[in-house]
Amino acid sequence: MKFSPLVDELIQSLRCLPGVGPKSAQRMAFQLLERDRKAGAKLADSLAKAMSDVGHCQSCRTFTEETYCPICVSTKRGHSDIICVVETPADVLAIEAGGHFSGRYFVLLGHLSPLDGVGPEELGLALLEQHLASGDVSELILATNPTVEGDATAHYIADMAKRHELMVSRIAHGVPVGGELEYVDSTTLALSFNGRLPI
């Protein structure tokens, strides 16, 4: 059955969200149109405002409505000499939720992927290089994802940082807390053994 052009456009628009296929998009569209038009209008308004007003921090590249994000302007953290490099703004939120890091961030907004046309320029590495050359950074923590692309990105940035004689470290990878060994893949298990710590 074919829907009206506006309903069909709404369904197709919702499919741009990660993990949303045709059926899920249809259910969402129908929910908003049948039962919750007020929430649909609020969603449309919030989406329009976010798309027009949210940009990237001029220092770390995370999301913000201002020129600089709250972490970069913080008197406690904005002058930290430790920078943690992550792939996405969601990674910043995950680390912040843990509450164990009190330095600054640099958000790559992706990872090196030459086949997809993503090189150092797209990741803002010239800006990161400026931070490293400023003399205000003593340590770089690489928190890219443990994927082939994440590893390649981490190695590229580590080489860049070593030219500035900075301490460079990479977050540990291994068995998650509460995980059972029989369900852990062999690569993760190997990383866990290689990165074991004395107790």
Swiss-Prot record:
Highest taxon listed in the record's lineage: Bacteria
Record SMART domains: TOPRIM
Record keyword Lipid metabolism present: no
SUPFAM superfamilies according to UniProt: Recombination protein RecR
Record keywords, A-Z: DNA damage, DNA recombination, DNA repair, Metal-binding, Zinc, Zinc-finger
Residue spans, zinc finger C4-type: 57-72
Chain ranges of the Toprim domain: 81-176
GO molecular function: DNA binding; zinc ion binding
A UniProt-annotated Pfam family: RecR_C
Database matches in NCBIfam families: recR
Entry function: May play a role in DNA repair. It seems to be involved in an RecBC-independent recombinational process of DNA repair. It may act with RecF and RecO.
Family of this protein: Belongs to the RecR family.
Protein name according to UniProt: Recombination protein RecR
Species in which this protein is naturally found: Shewanella halifaxensis (strain HAW-EB4)
